[in-house]
């Protein structure tokens, strides 16, 4: 076997392993939050970025083996930004044989008219985009709207709200729209951004730049993202621990009187499970909750070189 063939098999093995992990993450999120049900028509919002490409690919993959039947329709909103490559997504989706719709709305022109030069346009743009996508979902008869936010996005939003908004509020994996007509799901909620990036690189998706609008990036979110990346580098497993914390909320040990009846605690009240810690020293496990050792993609299991592509 030549060196090139050996490398090719190794790369394929690693890609299969990565795809299997992403499939597992997405499958668990779908099951935990009942994201997809029998007969659902899922509108997959495709921006042309790594996250939405990965979401579509994994959902298509799961569709082949899922115990329920559901359909997918990819939707892209062409906001008429200068330089937007209109041909990329139609060509890609037609090659895949995926049902799709390109919605053309000049939200770029509206935003430029309303927002002064140099100001961040993301907020208005997001509201306009949301309304158009909700309308499109109704037109297509979609029962669910799938967005490509991942685990890192959810954590960033939690810290953004804590640092700048004074709220412990993240980004829900599943929600009902304000008008009560649309269910939004985030199938990548359990997926790590670095896994998505590696998968997108390996699959060579035709990525469309996200800076075509010329808007300044959300500097506050960038600060949070840099902070989390630094923590992940210096303290392996802490990101997993923090995400696990979002799934293990104990209202009786916070300070929100809307979530727990502190005033109602009197002599004779029921005992709060785990509540008698006032004089105890905190017991923190040495190994972070939810942490798993980082897999070394350079280590090749010779016994599994001939693994077939994940179906």
From Swiss-Prot:
Pathway participation: tRNA modification
Just give the chief location class.
cytoplasm
Positions with a binding annotation for [4Fe-4S] cluster? 122, 125, 213
- Keywords assigned: 4Fe-4S, ATP-binding, Cytoplasm, Iron, Iron-sulfur, Magnesium, Metal-binding, Nucleotide-binding, RNA-binding, Transferase, tRNA processing, tRNA-binding
Give the transmembrane ranges.
none
Q: Which GO terms describe its biological process?
A: tRNA thio-modification
- Quaternary assembly: Homodimer.
Q: What else is known?
A: The thiolation reaction likely consists of two steps: a first activation step by ATP to form an adenylated intermediate of the target base of tRNA, and a second nucleophilic substitution step of the sulfur (S) atom supplied by the hydrosulfide attached to the Fe-S cluster.
Family, according to the entry, reads as follows:
Belongs to the TtcA family.
Q: What name is this protein filed under?
A: tRNA-cytidine(32) 2-sulfurtransferase
| Source organism of the structure | Escherichia coli O139:H28 (strain E24377A / ETEC)
Originating gene: ttcA
């Amino acid at each position: 076997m030549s060196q090139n063939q050996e490398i090719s098999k190794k790369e394929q093995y690693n890609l299969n392993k990565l795809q299997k992990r992403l499939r597992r993450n997405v499958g668990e999120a779908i099951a935990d939050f009942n994201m997809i049900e029998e007969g659902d028509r899922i509108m997959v919002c495709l921006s042309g970025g790594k996250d939405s490409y990965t979401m579509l690919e994994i959902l298509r993959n799961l569709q082949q083996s899922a115990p329920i039947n559901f359909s997918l329709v990819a939707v892209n909103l062409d906001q008429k930004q200068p330089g937007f490559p209109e041909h990329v997504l139609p060509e890609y989706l037609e090659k895949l044989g995926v049902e799709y719709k390109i919605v053309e709305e000049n939200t770029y022109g509206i935003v430029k008219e309303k927002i002064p030069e140099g100001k961040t346009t993301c907020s208005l743009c997001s509201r306009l985009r949301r309304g158009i996508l909700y309308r499109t979902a109704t037109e297509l008869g979609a029962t669910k709207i799938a967005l490509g936010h991942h685990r890192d996005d959810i954590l960033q939003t939690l810290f953004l709200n804590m640092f700048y908004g004074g709220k412990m509020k993240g980004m829900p994996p599943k929600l009902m729209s304000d008008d009560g007509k649309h269910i939004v799901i985030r199938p990548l909620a359990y997926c790590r951004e670095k896994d998505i990036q590696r998968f997108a690189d390996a699959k060579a998706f035709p990525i469309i730049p996200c800076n075509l609008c010329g808007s300044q990036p959300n500097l506050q979110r960038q600060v949070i993202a840099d902070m989390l990346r630094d923590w992940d580098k210096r303290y392996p497993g802490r990101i997993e621990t923090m995400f696990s914390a979002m799934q293990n909320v104990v209202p009786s040990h916070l300070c929100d009187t809307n979530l727990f009846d502190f005033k109602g605690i009197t002599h004779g009240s029921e005992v709060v499970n785990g509540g008698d810690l006032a004089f105890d020293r905190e017991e923190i496990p040495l190994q972070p909750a939810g942490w798993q050792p980082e897999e070394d993609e350079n280590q090749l299991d010779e016994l599994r070189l001939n693994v077939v592509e994940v179906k």
